[in-house]
Amino acid sequence: MDIITGSMTALITPFKNGKVDLQKYESLIKRQIAQGINAVSPVGTTGESATLSHKEHKECIEVAVATCKNSGVKVLAGAGSNATHEACDIAKFAQEVGADGILSIAPYYNKPTQEGLYQHYKAIANSVELPLMLYNVPGRTGVDLLPETAIRLFDDVKNIYGIKEATGSLERATSLMSARKDFVVVSGDDSVDFPMLASGARGIISVTSNLLPNLKSKLVSSVLEGDYKTSLSIHNDLYELNKTLFCESNPIPIKAAMYLSGLLDSLEFRLPLTNPSAETMQKLEKILIKYEVIK
């Protein structure tokens, strides 16, 4: 099984006049490819998947696959839903169009038991042959995929290979990695990327890399090559930016930052997400000037 690790970007989804701007989406992915990212992950939390139709969800995956074809950059397609059959449908589509793997968030709102989470993920993984990465972010889903459940899935289901751990807990990450040496953990929280990597994580799925893919790629490649000093320096340098990019609910600040830096032509969200406050826009402009992203 060809697993997906390294520097990965949780792609934003651009809108134009209320519709997904697939042309802009393609150009954003091409920029990721040019700046050294290892993989892109379309239609996850940062991609506003919860407010996309199934048709739009699939269109984004298809564009990502087509854009990354023959580039060496892999596509870890978002295939999460709180309805298991819907997640299976998206996963099957991703496989059909040529995605390299599946990233599936824990089902939100339903609050399933650990057995329910186990059966949910087992069903998705068994519906495809692609490698599947679990995704745990209890602060957004209302349910915590516990380490023992994640390891049970890894042991029982051949194509489940790891987890995007977005609790920000180094203890949680260490407990997972110590349980099974081959179980892949990647950081899902920009604020702890270096500590996670230094502790044995095999990569990151980053929000900040939408804006600075070259630096986030360098952060990961450096530590994986044993150059901890360079990686730590980049991580610490990005601290203030990372903090500002999460001053409101993700992906509001990152899309605003991309708009201010000229990467997006319009700043649009779908309700219930709204544009950032004037105060946040001022914070973002100030930090982007400081980091020389804009003048």
Swiss-Prot record:
Q: What is its EC number?
A: 4.3.3.7
> Which pathway does the UniProt entry assign to this protein?
Amino-acid biosynthesis; L-lysine biosynthesis via DAP pathway; (S)-tetrahydrodipicolinate from L-aspartate: step 3/4
Q: Which domain of life is it from?
A: Bacteria
Q: List, from the UniProt record, the residues annotated as the active site of this protein.
A: Y135 (proton donor/acceptor), K164 (schiff-base intermediate with substrate)
> Cross-referenced PROSITE patterns, in alphabetical order?
DHDPS_2 (PS00666)
The UniProt entry's GO biological process terms, in alphabetical order, are: diaminopimelate biosynthetic process; lysine biosynthetic process via diaminopimelate
InterPro entries to which the protein is assigned, alphabetical: Aldolase_TIM, DapA, DapA-like, Schiff_base-form_aldolases_AS
Record's subcellular location: Cytoplasm
Task: Name the enzyme group at the top EC level.
Answer: lyase
SUPFAM superfamilies named among the record's database cross-references: Aldolase
Q: Which GO terms describe its cellular component?
A: cytosol
Similarity field: Belongs to the DapA family.
- The protein depicted here goes by the name 4-hydroxy-tetrahydrodipicolinate synthase
